[in-house]
Every structure is written in structure tokens, then in C-alpha cells.
Amino acid sequence: MEQEGQEKKKEGRLTLVLALRTLIAAFGSSFQYAYNVSVCNSPSELMTEFYNDTYYDRTGELIDEFPLTLLWSVTVSMFPSGGFAGSLLVGPLVNKFGRKGALLFNNIFSIVPAILMGCSKVARSFELIIISRLLVGICAGVSSNVVPMYLGELAPKNLRGALGVESQLFITLGILVAQIFGLRSIRQQKGWPILLGLTGGPAAAACPPFFPESPRYLLIGQEPRCRQKALQSLRGWDSVDRELEEIRREDEAARAAGLVSVRALCAMRGLAWQLISVVPLMWQQLSGVNAIYYYDQIYLSPLDTDTQYYTAATGAVNVLMTVCTVFVVESWARLLLLLGFSPLAPTCCVLTAALALQDTVSWMPYISIVCIIVYVIGHAIGPAIRSLYTEIFLQSGRPPTWWGQVHWLSNFTVGLVFPLIQWAGLYSFIIFGVACLSTTVYTFLIVPETKGKSFIEIIRRFIRMNKVEVSPDREELKDFPPDVSE
């Protein structure tokens, strides 16, 4: 009994090996993803000027304003387009190469475009930038799905939430670094290609070959000695039989389900509540946070000081709150973190009023700053969302990356819809406020708690919610067809 108690105590420890491997993997993938989200914002004027100069050198004519705007929109939209394409590749990549192998293969889509973008000005080719944005979007689409999956499967259940937040932490750091590098005091007219090319560095560190594969994936590949060795390396001790047994039981449930595709996931009654629980991921993208990051310089333009410093300050607040979340995610319930959306709806109303009055009331822009910071804090509190989809699906349901496709489709939708709702002007944030309120209510009523539970315990709860017949000794999901893979 005493030995069992010691084993349980050990399972709650964060070993140095586990910490280093999760930190480096999250840095190499999530950091470069976020860096590419923000890196084009500050040098956009210099880049469009380069587009115009290049076209003039070729034809002797300048690009008209509308075609130039359209060309820049294509450049920006290539990133989420590539992200959606990358999310479609996740299933084949992780099933063929494993979690670690998929991250190693994914480096191609970051290092190659980094070189192309770094050489674009010398080559006098803006087409290289457009193509590179598509390729680096593919890299982001793969990494934003595989990294949370990889981190969630490496971590013991009592640390899964905290380690899962690491990817979100490096996303906020990537945004902050891109904002700092974009400050006018640092950025130089000839330095923006270097700014774009820096994305290749973190990708090279994403997942060194000597990193272990996910023990849960190794169970699928029928490599018992490899998975035991990998788990012992992560935990720092030899006694891992208890956790291996838990992994084996999950594997039995996954084998009963078979490998499933996204279409099959949507059609299966046995996964109805899991799919419903992923809806807040879509609402997170539709809640207007991208508008805050992309257009805050417009909102703060009445201020006399340089608004780029306020932009960097919001990025710093985002990082700080995400760091705080790492330490509280295992102490607080997941739902409490997900409900970080709750203050955003009234914040949208106050921000709308502040923006409407900032030209007539001198101190209103500072109210806008406070609202923007509150908005950023609310979104920073919600990174537990990223670990949610790893927790609620079995092995067979993770590779299709339902979460990833929802994320990138929502991201792309925001990019298309936001210009259309700008007719509402300042009142567009009322629309975002409705989205935030809807997310809060939906999360409270629908999404179940997963804190401190093993994958099997979480699946058991969903089985009861889905009203699926269960065999207690084998955890077979009778509602699943024997083979639903395409």
C-alpha cells in the first residue's frame, strides 16, 4: 500500500526531462506559428512598397490602389489557407510518422519558406513571399494540431492541463516578439526580409530526433519495449506499469473504434457530445480577438504617443496572463478557465462606447486601452481549450483533428467576414460581444469538466452522456462500426 502511494506521488512530479522536452517542442512549433501571425503587421507598408517597386521595375508602371490592396490581402490570407491545408495533413502524418515524426517532417514547411522570404527582396520577387506564406501556413496548421496532442500524451494526467498550456504560452510569446521586432525604433527599412526569415530558427528546434515518441502512439504501433523506455525516460523512474496499464486500456477502447476520419466522426452517435463540446473552439475565433490585435493601432490613433508601444504592451499582458494560467490550470477547474469569456461581452459594450466618444472626450482612448487589456486577459485565460480536444477523444479520434479544421475554418471565416461587418463601424464589437456571451452560456451548459481525470475516465463519462452500450471489462464502444476509416 505504501509503495502504491509513493508511485502515485511520483506520477505527479514534473521531471526535468519532461519539462525540457515539452518546452522545446512547444517553442519550436507554437512560437513560430504565432510569430507568423503577427510578423507582417508592422512592416506591411514597407512590404507593399516593395510590391509596388518590384512591379514598376518589371513593367514601368505602378500598381493601382485596389489591386495593391487585393495583392496584400492575398498575401495575408495565404497563411490561414495554408493552415487549413495543414490541418488536413495531420491525420496521415501522425498515423504514418507518429507525433514526433510529424513534427520533424513539418520542419520542411517552415525552414524552406523562411529561406525564400529572406531572399525575396534580393530576388526582387514578391511572389516568393506569397508562396512562402502558404507554406508556412501549412506548417502552422500541422504544428497547432500535433503539438497539443504530443504534449497531452507525454504528460501525466495531473500535469496534462499545465503542460498543454505551454503551447499557448509560446503562441503569446511569438506574438509579443513579432510586435517588439516591429517597433519603429528597431525595425529598419532594409531589415524586414530578415524579420520574415527568422521563422525558420524555432522550427529547427521543434523536435530533435532524440526526443521520445508519445508512449500512447507507440502502443498503436505495437512496440512494448519502446513505449516502456520512452515512458521511463519521461517519468524518471522504472516503475511505470500502472500508467502503461492505463494506456493499454485506452488502446483497447481505441481499437474497438478503429481509425476514424472527420466525416466518420461527425456521423457517429458515440461521439456526439465530444463534437458538441468542441464548439467553443470555433466561438473563440469568432469573438473578435484577431480584430483587437490587427486594428488596435486604428482604435488608439487619437493618442499622442506611438500606438505600437501599446500594441506591444497588450502582447506582454497576454504572455503574463498565460504564464499565470500555467500555474492555476491544475488547481482550478477547466470550466472556470473556459469561462474567461464571461467578462468580454460587457467589455465589448464599454469599448464600443469609448471608441464612439474618443474624438470628443480626451480621456476616452485610455478607457479603450483598459478595455483592450481586459479583452486580452479574457482570451489569455482560455488556453485550457487547447488541451480539451486531446482529453475528450480516444487515440482513433485525435488524428482527424476536428479541432484543427474548426480552428482554421473559423480563422479564415473571420478574415473574410470582418471586412464585411465593418459597415457597422465602431458597433462591430457588439457583434463580437454577442459571440462572447454565447460562448459563455454554451460552455457553462454543455462542456463537461475534465480536470484530474484519465483519458479512460473522461471517455467513460462521454459514453454515459452519449448513451452508448459499454462492455465494462473491455471498454468497447458498441455504437462504433468495426472499421470506419477511409
UniProtKB/Swiss-Prot annotation:
The organism's place on the tree of life at top rank? Eukaryota
One of the entry's Gene Ontology molecular-function terms is: D-glucose transmembrane transporter activity
Annotated Gene Ontology cellular component terms: apical plasma membrane; plasma membrane; sarcolemma
- Give the primary localization class: membrane
Enumerate the Pfam families for this protein. Sugar_tr
UniProt keyword Cell division, yes or no? no
What membrane topology term does the record carry? Multi-pass membrane protein
Alphabetical list of InterPro entries matching this protein:
Fru_transpt_5, GLUT, MFS_dom, MFS_sugar_transport-like, MFS_trans_sf, Sugar/inositol_transpt, Sugar_transporter_CS
**PROSITE patterns recorded:** MFS (PS50850), SUGAR_TRANSPORT_2 (PS00217)
Entry-linked SUPFAM superfamilies: MFS general substrate transporter
Give me the glycosylation sites of this protein. 52
Q: Which PANTHER family match?
A: SOLUTE CARRIER FAMILY 2, SOLUTE CARRIER FAMILY 2, FACILITATED GLUCOSE TRANSPORTER MEMBER 5
Regarding protein family, the annotation reads:
Belongs to the major facilitator superfamily. Sugar transporter (TC 2.A.1.1) family. Glucose transporter subfamily.
Designated name of the protein: Solute carrier family 2, facilitated glucose transporter member 5
